[in-house]
Amino acid sequence: MEKFTTHTGVGVPLQRSNVDTDQIIPAVYLKRVTRTGFEDGLFSNWRQNDPNFVLNTETYKNGSVLIAGPDFGTGSSREHAVWALMDYGFRAVFSSRFADIFRGNSGKAGLLTGIMEQSDIELLWKLMEQTPGLELTVNLEKQIVTAGDVVISFEVDPYIRWRLMEGLDDAGLTLRKLDEIEDYEAKRPAFKPRTNA
């Protein structure tokens, strides 16, 4: 997993609340068994049926910092929703509230989910409306987002923050213990099952 310390990208104002995982990526796209190729499914119902949807505009189609309304990622637990956001190019999503499971899935995959006050979300929406294509800089170490002269703090679970800054997914966490695993396996009797030949 790629380390996350700072990221600068175009902010995308998703001025909708209660965006559930079925809206993020409909179930029809969940048939793949790989973790890539989901960008076409991201918000597909809105992108296909609303020509004015934010991701259909030239200004925001390459955005990488999503500023969403409250209760983002609710509904069923779909890692595919996180994968779709990341495949599209998003590195961070900010909202005043996230579903716990979505937030956990995001942290494990490398997508930052930062919690801001709703008034700060609305301030960012206003700034992006005034300056379409506004670049936002996310500093995970300091837990701030900078938009021009405006600096806004955000919250993130300390454990997820550490994992993102270290670039550690579940496999990476396990590999940190590789010496201990190999030592344990070397001491196991030969008649017991082994993980290596």
Swiss-Prot record:
It catalyses: (2R,3S)-3-isopropylmalate = (2S)-2-isopropylmalate. SUPFAM superfamilies: LeuD/IlvD-like. It is an enzyme of class 4 (lyase). Its EC number is 4.2.1.33. Coiled coil: none annotated. One of its GO terms (biological process) is L-leucine biosynthetic process. Pathway: Amino-acid biosynthesis; L-leucine biosynthesis; L-leucine from 3-methyl-2-oxobutanoate: step 2/4. It comes from the Bacteria. Keywords: Amino-acid biosynthesis, Branched-chain amino acid biosynthesis, Leucine biosynthesis, Lyase. GO terms for molecular function: 3-isopropylmalate dehydratase activity. Belongs to the LeuD family. LeuD type 1 subfamily. Heterodimer of LeuC and LeuD. This is 3-isopropylmalate dehydratase small subunit. It comes from Corynebacterium glutamicum (strain R). The lineage of its organism: Bacteria, Bacillati, Actinomycetota, Actinomycetes, Mycobacteriales.
